[in-house]
Amino acid sequence: MKGLLDLFKQFTPDEHFDAIKIGLASPEKIRSWSFGEVKKPETINYRTFKPERDGLFCAKIFGPIKDYECLCGKYKRLKHRGVICEKCGVEVTQTKVRRDRMGHIDLAAPCAHIWFLKSLPSRLGLVLDMTLRDIERVLYFEAYVVTDPGMTPLKKFSIMTEDDYDTKKREFGDEFVALMGAEGIKQLLQEMDLDTEIDKLRNDMTGSELKVKKNSKRLKVMEAFKKSGIKPNWMVMDVLPVLPPDLRPLVPLDGGRFATSDLNDLYRRVINRNNRLARLLELKAPEIIVRNEKRMLQEAVDSLLDNGRRGKAMTGANKRALKSLADMIKGKSGRFRQNLLGKRVDYSGRSVITVGPYLKLHQCGLPKLMALELFKPFIFSRLEAMGIASTIKQAKKEVESGTPVVWDILEEVIKEHPVMLNRAPTLHRLGIQAFEPVLIEGKAIQLHPLVCSAFNADFDGDQMAVHVPLSIEAQMEARTLMLASNNVLFPASGEPSIVPSQDVVLGLYYATRERTNGLGEGMIFSDVVEVQRALDNKVVEITARISVRLTEWLRPEDGSDNFEPHTSLIHTTVGRALLSEILPKGLPFSVMNKALKKKEISRLINTAFRKCGLKATVVFADKLLQSGFRLATRAGISIAIDDMLVPKQKQMLIERAENEVKEIEQQYVSGLVTAGERYNKVVDIWGKTGDEVGKVMMSQLSKQKVIDRNGKEVDQESFNSIYMMADSGARGSAAQIRQLAGMRGLMAKPDGSIIETPITANFREGLNVLQYFISTHGARKGLADTALKTANSGYLTRRLVDVTQDLVVIEDDCGTDNGMAMRALVEGGEVIESLRDRILGRVTAIDVTHPETQEVLVLAGKMLDEDTMEVLEAAGVDEVKVRTSLTCDTRFGICAKCYGRDLGRGGLVNQGEAVGVIAAQSIGEPGTQLTMRTFHIGGAASRAAVASSVDAKSDGIIGFNSTMRYVTNAKGELVVISRSGEIIITDPHGRERERHKVPYGAILNVKPDQTLKAGTILGNWDPLTRPIITEFAGHTRFENVEEGVTVAKQVDEVTGLSTLVVIDPKRRGSAKVVRPQVKLLDVNGQEVKIPGTDHSVTIGFPIGALIQVRDGQDVMPGEVLARIPVEGQKTRDITGGLPRVAELFEARTPKDKGILAEVTGTVSFGKETKGKVRLQITDPEGKVYEELVPKEKNIVVHEGQVVNKGESIIDGPADPQDILRLLGVEELARYIVDEVQDVYRLQGVKINDKHIEVIVRQMLRRVQITNPGDSHYILGEQVERSELFGTNDKLRAQDKLPATYSDVLLGITKASLSTDSFISAASFQETTRVLTEAAIMGKRDELRGLKENVIVGRLIPAGTGMAYHQARKAKDELDDNERRLIAMQEAQEALAAVDADMADSAGNAAE
């Protein structure tokens, strides 16, 4: 029977397609889709439930209601398939054709498509060169448009009101034609000749910038119409397609009411108005009535296409705006994001998770009931195969009765069939992993404790979902790629993800600690077995120091896998000796012969992975886990209130602080300090005190006095439970212990400002009511913050994924030798990130040579692994040029060499790896750990910023960077006068050890090439004021320094001294803008000139400066002329955390941005205009570049200074666009990478640089055409980089002029929307705008990215899917060739047959 039914299945050939095209439908096209015209607004007959004929659900147009049965019931059954009933006109076929048969409505008057009218920029407006307002007035019958001026002076395209029209009609009669409504617009569009318009525009690309911009926009649209073969008048519709009825269903509810899709209401409105208009036209009704009806029809069509886009949205009976066709596809619940990108999955279940401590890493516990349900089909087929059940129905019964044989079969079916576990939210690829199921009783899924950190799961009620991979291919991929034991590293950083936490760490830590004078200290054992026996018999304790003979299995010199035993007597402790049993072969015991804190365990697992491989590591991790649980139980570590030791010095410290605060209050009352300073100082004092109490408490907790074997009292590390928990990294931190036993310290108000009275109590002593109340602020803000953070972080991840989703490794090597020079990241003299961390797992771009002997250490094109890094570190290499994804030349993808190591697997990245998505996940996943706040500099936050000196961390030789300039003052001290000076300390070989920024005005204590010892102070400065220093000697002459106009005298109330302060010009009496400044005169009274120029030395005083010299005083170089108190500077908010990362990736221009020098040259100041300073830079050719700078900006250059292109001339945060324009791609990448890393580093999150580089590559993927050459591009057009390179290659091959371009930096949202794939862009944001644009251009989506392929339901072109697509392409080419061959053969055979026939007939004739 089944075979018979298969015969009747309608065969649909497998459709292979390589691209999807979108366009505007012509009226003919719409009619060709249609199966009939919908003439009536009726839907279904409410009594018979049958669809009305010619209505919106008409069976004649759209197909039958029941399978193979016409409406009147004359033809039933399969045998009449394809018959059209003569009575009711319905074709006898399957009912599912009602999902794809369309109808149409012939509109009685043309209607404009609202998308092309209202979606900005208005396409209709661009084509017609009319304003949107004018077009709307014409369309909605408020004005006439002239379509044919005839012999009259009227202009075509001009607009006239009704009164104008009447006057002109009287004046000119029928000489001209002016129309109203969509007819007029359609007429104009029809008469438009694209070719002439394009030529006109191409020749008219001169004149003002605005005109050129406007013309190039129009040109782009016109070219698009011409290229795609779409006629502009199709933007006005004569025929409206009708959606198939099953896609806008009408469902009868009980009680005789109906639930209907909003579209039916909208269609009914259109049909009603259309029919009424047709009737009015037939009756030749008065113009005004017809006009109103036409307007209403246009509005109805607008609402159907995009409700609410113009005017008020149409509403249904319940005052709710109706969902139009546009609403169906856009937004989170639209077609794209709800149904195409997010589908529900069959064969899945979910349940609560619990711990499975006895599981192996690749296993999970699956409840029997769940497994039975999930694997049902497999069980049915086994039952049938074994002959226990003959039909599926019988098998069902068997399973439901739960006979023992069913459970046996379940065991069998489940064996070696991996299942996938997922925990929402799935923030990175480790959120879904495959496990082998183990059947368990109960109803909770059991999860291996080591994978918790990857899933971010805990057992406080979390739920997880189970999915069953069905096909053999799916099972294979789950096993080889997704099995938990194959994913032991985080793809974000390459750190191990299977690191034990909490009690396991505590157990291992306790067992590997040493105790002075422990039971059995100093004993010597022959092997581990003996140690175990001694422990069991309580002769030794687990923390005692002993010596034991151990055998280590080490890898031989030649690196082969034949491990050699090395036996020796080792000093260690009992616990460590016992743990040595589980050490994998190839690791020396020294890696374990220390107290195992969490970091150490992580390092241990990492070392094991690099040295012993994956399998050994997984086994080792499992054993560590078992040991950790067992030892933690044995240790019996508990927590008690007496473990929280409050230091005795606490009271004294607090009293001291209170006295200091009193002193400052006194100073404030006497007017020595301002209110702001008082607040800052008080907060500072309490902050310091809190830290001191914390320090004292920790030192008390962490040490304890014990008697050693010789009877002496010694300090040993404490065995205090709370200290051990924090020290091992199991739970808690120093800050939390400080709140338990130190003092809670300062609290913040809800607005983020710090309350200046701290909580001096701790939790052990208990808080009073006021203290408790103060601390509730912070706690609640924390909860509110978390909720906001999650949403924001999710949105950032979504944007990142969208911008990188089509970046896949598609070839092994692009052959470029470009790269980026990497060196250790040093800030404030401290190495923040070593060279090793930055280049590990990268591929060298050029040979790396030994700094002294110049021998080649690493060849170009080699991946730097751990062993190579040791060689480089030994040689002291401090800079390596490595390949990076930014300089990769691969088109439409990236190559493996430029990407480097796949961090999640530890080898060179495979072809087909979706590195873009991995980068996005790696940056997005820790997003929830970042803060949401913006920090105010002030109070506790600023303490880090106030350094007043800098000292050397290592011995070496002093050098200065190229921009460092200094003068010697009267005392013989060196005073820094450059803004970006840095001191560099190098070792004797000339390798950089550290570099320190020194601010303007600092006094240097060292000279160039001086050799110094670590700890020497290099320079010091006053952190609270910014000085203004003269570089030249001379006699001062003040200009514009007038009291009450530009300066005010401030008299200090206490000391009675007076100083001049420069005041803000906004508050001055006079309207004239003058800038107070000082000039220097030489002995002859002439103005001192800057050497080599004829500019006088002029030093301006900024607002808020305290002038330190008198008029007419003699000054020496390096002397301070004025000081600006830092307090007077506006405290800049630092954007931190998540908003900062988003700001960087969106490439937003910061507010109050710094300005960089556009050219290299000499600085001078021109004459001032309206509150702005004219800053000029003269380049070596003598060209002058000008920048107008508002007065209140802080200019960091001075007259006569030579600046390099891209150097900062005005203080403030850098604008990434400027960095790209002036300094290039590499500097930009460096800036973004460093800034993003700063944010994550603050939270202690490790992310590899390459992920951020991948995102930057995608932000730079479009270029702007600066000269089109012989290409078809338009000046200023933005094009995909890969596409442009392809075009240029073709042009060069034909000896034509290639197009030139400049780099463009787009923010991630912009970049996602401007991709070449319209499907991907439409499913991201602004669906309407993207589709409108794509339709006009007749865009073709090549389906290159992952998203497009998911949407159209193909395998994604990444991973195993990439191989599939490549194979398919190859097969298609083969097939084509084969077809040609076969065709040729057939032709030859046919010819031969003809010849034979002719020979035959000739023979017959002869006979």
Curated annotation (Swiss-Prot):
Gene3D superfamilies: 1.10.132.30, 1.10.150.390, 1.10.1790.20, 1.10.40.90, 2.40.40.20, 2.40.50.100, RNA polymerase II, clamp domain, RNA polymerase Rpb1, domain 3. Zn(2+) 1 binds at residues 70, 72, 85, 88. GO terms for molecular function: DNA binding; DNA-directed RNA polymerase activity; magnesium ion binding; zinc ion binding. It holds the Pfam family RNA_pol_Rpb1_5. Its EC number is 2.7.7.6. SUPFAM superfamilies: beta and beta-prime subunits of DNA dependent RNA-polymerase. Keywords: DNA-directed RNA polymerase, Magnesium, Metal-binding, Nucleotidyltransferase, Transcription, Transferase, Zinc. It comes from the Bacteria. Zn(2+) 2 binds at residues 814, 888, 895, 898. It catalyses: RNA(n) + a ribonucleoside 5'-triphosphate = RNA(n+1) + diphosphate. HAMAP family: RNApol_bact_RpoC. The RNAP catalytic core consists of 2 alpha, 1 beta, 1 beta' and 1 omega subunit. When a sigma factor is associated with the core the holoenzyme is formed, which can initiate transcription. Belongs to the RNA polymerase beta' chain family. DNA-dependent RNA polymerase catalyzes the transcription of DNA into RNA using the four ribonucleoside triphosphates as substrates. This is DNA-directed RNA polymerase subunit beta'. It comes from Leptothrix cholodnii (strain ATCC 51168 / LMG 8142 / SP-6) (Leptothrix discophora (strain SP-6)).
